[in-house]
């Protein structure tokens, strides 16, 4: 039959590529679960009173090429000026071998946080490299595997300083007056909720205040000056005051390590190591401390341990400090950090090595010296006599200078009184320096780069001798071996091959939404129009970004039912914090500052209580009933008891137990009745989009995990984006920014991230996803996520009981498999099943959350029936193996489950097990075989023998 042109054009082709099951597969799966259609299934599962009467107005789907063309036109409105603004952001030259083999490689960007170390050894090694770089450059004993950005790291440093301080009565934190303004902004915000007083002044004035528990210094100062803080930090140490230093990672290549000068905590942005500015992010922050403070440190830490065979293996160490275990008592609410960006920065150091980094840093400094010499020769006055890469130049008519710079396509720092700032970088050329001479001295400046270069050799050093680094850096072989592109490419490939990511198999982690990150969505993040903009450039140069953010915000308003979106939070945890801050500030604006109690169901994710504590709230736990639902009687009692102290409730929907609670609107009404606000955690938005919205349900604020629901990849543990949606009454109280004004936000509202729009350069991913799916496609995605979960639950429920179900025995987009009865009867645990799945070629589901002894499975809409059946068949085969243990065919201490996973090395070694080699390593055939590089990790050994630096190459 002849098809029409409209039929052949088929605008919805991307929807069919994003959604895994074909139409025929969907029909089969519906028949298995006992539903006639997707709409009928949703009617059985989602409470009728919260289902949307009409679809969200986000438009129809565009094809991949149409969406890319639209976004390219929007990106073209951004103007790519040379930005010498500095303030913690610099242009970079990302090595193409890293761009191609890491940033554009799904083996790196689709992986999850390495909770399962046996399938994560590649990126764990990459993160260990990053930690080694941090330790070497900071001169401290222990480093984390990244934080969200430099300003957030500063706030974490302040919080840590208070935790480790022996001055328990001190409540003041001193900040030197040459710290970056955006850093001070975020520190003030955090101090507000902790009840700390921020004191700003000259660094030496810190000694004048006896009530200070910690001090924040900056090396290099925001205006470019270098400091020798050795004497100051020695004096502070004598008074038991904690010294924190924000550092420039490139400058540290040449400068004395702050740890050697006496700093207790050192942090900064790793952006300069190969990561584009991206209008503010994402960028990894580095963070280091002294060994005696290791248990007070925030963020992930990678440690060296051993596996069951006694071989060296890596894992996340000291997890008991973190929110998923300690909840409101955690060191931080940080969950996702910036792993992909930390890996890029670490690999930048691996590729260039110590000598290459010294050349890069030395060239930047030399060009700065040449620029300084020329400007001085031309009659201009510099504010400082020492510098690394940044000059502050006195000018008579600042506006005229800035205007002339713009005419040259150049941005200078503009917020300094009677002066302009210039920060050079690795992308700066000789021609760029000549252009700066022309801007500041006129076209007839007559200066010659070569002559200036020769002349400055005879002048005083602009890095004082006492600040020059004397010790070696990056002496480990990993930083001295892979300097040819061939070797680097192979090293990156070897690491990626050790990991299990979405490019090999589904990752059925509950509460994580490991869906497709389509190639068309990823392409725009490498476009220079998005990658090269400075976050503090003039707004008229970022019209494309502003348009894209405005469109995306408009779509998210429709999809959430809220009135406004704040894009600043650069992780889900930051979104929670920002949303709770908005609630806190709203209450304060109504003279109800006494509202400090936050109700949280016992099933909540660990970030919820950790974020509430960070926002200055006290947590009251609400019970759940036997079905996993919020106990309304307990909620009503606790809301009533809280009375005028009730601030809010934090609730996840569908619940963390994987069901749509029928009484969610009543929950909202009860909290509102007692004057509280409803924070609806957006972790499970993938089961809401197009079906219902938080606003329609009755919530006041939510964060959205764009790295889950809206297709930004997890990157092995970051980047993330956690924008918040708010009702109109909360909109004035979302985070502001002291450097870049944000429309509609009260100017006094402090920031939660360094950049005004968070990790703006990954927002095109979510823009592309929504544009290519349209309203109907987004609804189908939610429906298919729900169908896939119910299909798994139906097929597995006889082998593994589904712990919680809703109406008609249905689950939402994820299901919890109860392993506890099996463990009681056979001794086989959820851990054994998780590790045995590796032999079948799968990443494990989420273990023991939200209920100990369970596995939580979330398939997402992107997995086909073929892949889901492969997972189900693996789980059923494992159940049969458990039966063989129960029947005594295999002993409890020697069977394929407790010995899992099995490695290639074990396959060729002597074999004394009561099961065959083939069953061990090819339980489901060889087509989808994944080979783990290590056996099961020894967690106890790793924490008892903490070692968080690179190990000898012979150990790998």
From Swiss-Prot:
GO terms for cellular component: cytosol; glycine cleavage complex. Its EC number is 1.4.4.2. The modification N6-(pyridoxal phosphate)lysine is found at residue 708. GO terms for biological process: glycine decarboxylation via glycine cleavage system. Keywords: Oxidoreductase, Pyridoxal phosphate. CDD domains: GDC-P. Its cofactor is pyridoxal 5'-phosphate. Belongs to the GcvP family. It catalyses: N(6)-[(R)-lipoyl]-L-lysyl-[glycine-cleavage complex H protein] + glycine + H(+) = N(6)-[(R)-S(8)-aminomethyldihydrolipoyl]-L-lysyl-[glycine-cleavage complex H protein] + CO2. GO terms for molecular function: glycine binding; glycine dehydrogenase (decarboxylating) activity; pyridoxal phosphate binding. The glycine cleavage system catalyzes the degradation of glycine. The P protein binds the alpha-amino group of glycine through its pyridoxal phosphate cofactor; CO(2) is released and the remaining methylamine moiety is then transferred to the lipoamide cofactor of the H protein. It is an enzyme of class 1 (oxidoreductase). It comes from Pectobacterium carotovorum subsp. carotovorum (strain PC1). This is Glycine dehydrogenase (decarboxylating). It comes from the Bacteria. InterPro entries: GcvP, GDC-P_C, GDC-P_N, GDC_P, PyrdxlP-dep_Trfase, PyrdxlP-dep_Trfase_major, PyrdxlP-dep_Trfase_small. The glycine cleavage system is composed of four proteins: P, T, L and H.
């Amino acid at each position: 039959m002849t098809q029409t042109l409209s039929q052949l054009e088929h605008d919805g082709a991307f929807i069919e590529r994003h959604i895994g099951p074909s139409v025929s597969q969907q029909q089969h799966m519906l028949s298995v679960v006992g539903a006639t259609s997707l709409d009928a299934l949703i009617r059985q599962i989602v409470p009728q009173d919260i289902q949307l009467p009409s679809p969200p107005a986000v438009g129809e789907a565009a094809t991949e090429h149409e969406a890319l063309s639209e976004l390219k036109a929007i990106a073209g409105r951004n103007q790519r000026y040379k930005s010498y603004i500095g303030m913690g952001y610099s242009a970079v030259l990302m090595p193409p071998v890293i761009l191609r083999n890491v940033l554009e490689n799904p083996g790196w960007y689709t992986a999850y946080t390495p909770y399962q170390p046996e399938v994560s050894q590649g990126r764990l090694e990459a993160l260990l490299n990053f930690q080694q770089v941090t330790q070497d450059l900071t001169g401290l004993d222990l480093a984390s595997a990244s934080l969200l950005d430099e300003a957030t790291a500063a706030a974490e440093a302040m919080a840590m300083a208070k935790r480790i301080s022996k001055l328990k009565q001190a409540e003041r934190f001193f900040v030197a007056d040459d710290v970056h303004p955006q850093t001070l902004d975020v520190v003030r915000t955090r101090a507000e909720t902790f009840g700390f007083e921020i004191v700003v002044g000259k660094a030496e004035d810190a000694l004048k205040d006896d009530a200070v528990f910690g001090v924040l210094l900056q090396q290099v100062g925001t205006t470019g000056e270098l400091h020798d803080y050795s004497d100051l930090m020695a004096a502070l140490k004598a008074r038991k005051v904690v010294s924190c230093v924000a550092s420039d990672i490139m400058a540290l290549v040449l400068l004395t390590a702050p740890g050697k000068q006496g700093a207790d905590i050192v942090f900064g942005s790793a952006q300069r190591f190969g990561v584009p500015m991206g209008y503010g992010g994402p960028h990894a922050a580095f963070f280091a401390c002294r060994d005696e403070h290791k248990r007070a440190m925030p963020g992930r830490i990678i440690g060296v341990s051993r596996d069951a065979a006694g071989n060296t293996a890596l894992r996340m160490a000291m997890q008991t400090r973190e929110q998923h275990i300690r909840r409101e008592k955690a060191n931080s609410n940080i969950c996702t950090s910036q792993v992909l960006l930390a890996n890029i920065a670490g690999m930048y150091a691996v590729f260039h090595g110590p000598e290459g980094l010294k050349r890069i840093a030395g060239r930047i400094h030399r060009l700065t010296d040449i620029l300084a010499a020329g400007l001085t020769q031309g009659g201009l006055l510099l504010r400082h006599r020492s510098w690394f890469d940044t000059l502050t130049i006195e000018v008579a008519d600042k506006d005229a200078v800035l205007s002339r710079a713009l005419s040259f396509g150049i941005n200078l720092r503009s917020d300094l009184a009677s002066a302009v700032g210039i920060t050079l970088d690795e992308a700066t050329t000789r021609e760029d320096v000549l252009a700066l001479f022309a801007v500041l001295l006129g076209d007839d400046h007559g200066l010659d780069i070569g002559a200036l270069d020769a002349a400055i050799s005879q002048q005083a050093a602009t890095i004082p001798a006492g600040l020059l680094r004397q010790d070696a850096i990056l002496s480990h072989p990993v930083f001295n071996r892979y300097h040819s592109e061939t070797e680097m490419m192979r090293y990156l490939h070897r690491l990626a091959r050790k990991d299990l990511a979405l490019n090999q198999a589904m990752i059925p982690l509950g509460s994580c939404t490991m869906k497709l990150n389509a190639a068309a969505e990823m392409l725009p993040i490498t476009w220079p129009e998005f990658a090269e903009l400075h976050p503090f450039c003039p707004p008229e140069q970022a019209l494309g970004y502003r348009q894209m953010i405005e469109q995306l915000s408009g779509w998210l308003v429709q999809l959430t039912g809220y009135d406004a979106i704040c894009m600043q939070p650069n992780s889900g945890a930051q979104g929670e914090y920002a949303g709770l801050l908005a609630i806190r500030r709203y209450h304060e604006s109504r003279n109800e500052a006494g509202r400090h109690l936050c109700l949280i169901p016992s099933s909540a994710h660990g970030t919820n209580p950790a974020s509430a504590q960070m926002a200055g709230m006290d947590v009251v736990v609400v019970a759940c009933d036997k079905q996993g639902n919020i106990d309304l009687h307990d909620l009503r009692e606790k809301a009533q008891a809280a009375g005028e102290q009730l601030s809010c409730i934090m609730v996840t929907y569908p619940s963390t137990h994987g069901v749509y609670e029928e009484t969610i609107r009543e929950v909202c009404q009860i909290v509102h009745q007692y004057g509280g606000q409803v924070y609806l955690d957006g972790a499970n938005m993938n089961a809401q989009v197009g079906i219902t919205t938080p606003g329609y349900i009755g919530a006041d604020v939510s964060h959205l995990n764009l790295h889950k629901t809206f297709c930004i990849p997890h990157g092995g543990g970051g980047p993330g984006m956690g924008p918040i949606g708010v009702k109109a009454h909360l909109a004035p109280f979302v985070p502001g920014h002291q450097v870049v004004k944000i429309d509609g936000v009260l100017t006094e509202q402090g920031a939660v991230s360094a950049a005004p729009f968070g990790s703006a350069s990954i927002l095109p991913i979510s823009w592309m996803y929504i544009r290519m799916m349209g309203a109907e496609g987004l609804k189908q995605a939610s429906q298919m996520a729900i169908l896939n979960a119910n299909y798994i639950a139906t097929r597995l429920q006889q082998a593994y009981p589904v712990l919680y179900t809703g109406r008609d025995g249905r689950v939402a987009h994820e299901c919890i498999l109860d392993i506890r009865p099996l463990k009681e009867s056979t001794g086989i645990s959820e851990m054994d099943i998780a590790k045995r799945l590796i032999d079948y070629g799968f990443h494990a589901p989420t273990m023991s959350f939200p209920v100990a002894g369970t596995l939580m499975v979330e398939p997402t809409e992107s997995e086909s029936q073929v892949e889901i059946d492969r997972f189900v068949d693996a789980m059923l085969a494992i159940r049969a193996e458990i039966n063989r243990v129960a029947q005594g065919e295999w002993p409890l201490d020697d069977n394929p489950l407790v010995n899992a996973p099995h490695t290639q090395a074990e396959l060729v070694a002597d074999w004394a097990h009561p099961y065959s080699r083939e069953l061990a390593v090819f339980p489901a055939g060889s087509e989808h075989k994944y080979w783990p590089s290590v056996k099961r990790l020894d967690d106890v050994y790793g924490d008892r023998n903490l070692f968080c630096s690179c190990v000898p190459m012979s150990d790998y």
